[in-house]
Curated annotation (Swiss-Prot):
It comes from the Bacteria. NCBIfam families: infC. Monomer. The gene is infC. This is Translation initiation factor IF-3. One of its GO terms (molecular function) is translation initiation factor activity. It comes from Hamiltonella defensa subsp. Acyrthosiphon pisum (strain 5AT). Pfam families: IF3_C, IF3_N.
Amino acid sequence: MKPGKRVPLARPNRINKEIRVTEVRLTGIEGEQIGIVSIAVALQKAEEAGVDLVEISPNADPPVCRVMDYGKFLYEKSKSIKDQKKKQRVIQVKEVKFRPGTDEGDYQVKLRSLTRFLEEGDKAKITLRFRGREMAHQQIGMAMLERIRRDLCESENSIALVESFPARIEGRQISMVLAPKKKQ
């Protein structure tokens, strides 16, 4: 086969003359049950309506067929699949690093980015790293995490819930994870 040539995909549903059974359970255009009829009658009804006869459930006994516009059916199906994909969203964990000596301006900038992450629906991991003699002043780091928690979770317009708050320090850093609040 030549490169660049596509093989036409087989249709997921058989339509019109592709249906090779003697009788089918027929459903009308509006979804109303017509009953069990021969394939010739079903094809005639589809032709009278100016649409296709589509085999919906080939494994049923007798197979279920519906009188409908096949092109419109495929379009609506692809549209619903696109809508489902649009609604799916992978939640990421975004990390923001602080130090015990983070000044007010930097603190506000990092707080804004934390707010943005949470409003976008992502989780936020706050890591507070200690260097050198900062290890002797761990209470400053805990106070900073407490302040972040107050600003994002306990204010009147809180946007986050604490998922994990550190009870103690692991090595040279403390971590806290915040999850976005569910919107009502």
